[in-house]
Amino acid sequence: MALRLLLGFDYGTKQIGVAVGQVITGQARELCTLKAQNGVPDWNQVEALIKEWKPDAVVVGLPLNMDGTPSDMCLRAEKFARRLNGRYNLPFYTHDERLTTFEAKGERLVRGGQKGSYRDNPVDAIAAALLLQGWLDANAALFET
């Protein structure tokens, strides 16, 4: 199956950022932020996104430590990726998401956003777009014709 459209997920225990990316353009953009309860999203919202966007695969960010070793959250993010695969029969990929939230906060400031708390105006969707863009950039050679 040819990959054309991807959804990217920035997994978190309270919020999960979502982005969409197209292989043909090599571009990713933010979609939305889903609320989560202890890492569990509202699966009806996830299903609505899957039905609307009809992705060929999903990319889930892995929150690796700065030295490249898996963090405690990596296991939970991988479990989330496997659940997406099991529920929607979509292939999944994981991608290093180190510093994407930090970069997303900087991006929010550049756009004129707040400097304080990100609870009311989360950056998770921006982080999802950054990690998905990173995956697209890292795998561009796979899609060249």
UniProtKB/Swiss-Prot annotation:
SUPFAM superfamilies found in the cross-reference section: Ribonuclease H-like (SSF53098)
CDD domains: YqgF
UniProt keyword list: Cytoplasm, Hydrolase, Nuclease, Ribosome biogenesis
This enzyme's EC code(s): 3.1.-.-
Biological process, per Gene Ontology: rRNA 5'-end processing
Gene Ontology CC: cytosol
Location in or out of the cell: Cytoplasm
Family matches, as NCBIfam families: RNAse_H_YqgF
Full protein name: Putative pre-16S rRNA nuclease
Lineage: Bacteria, Pseudomonadati, Pseudomonadota, Gammaproteobacteria, Pseudomonadales
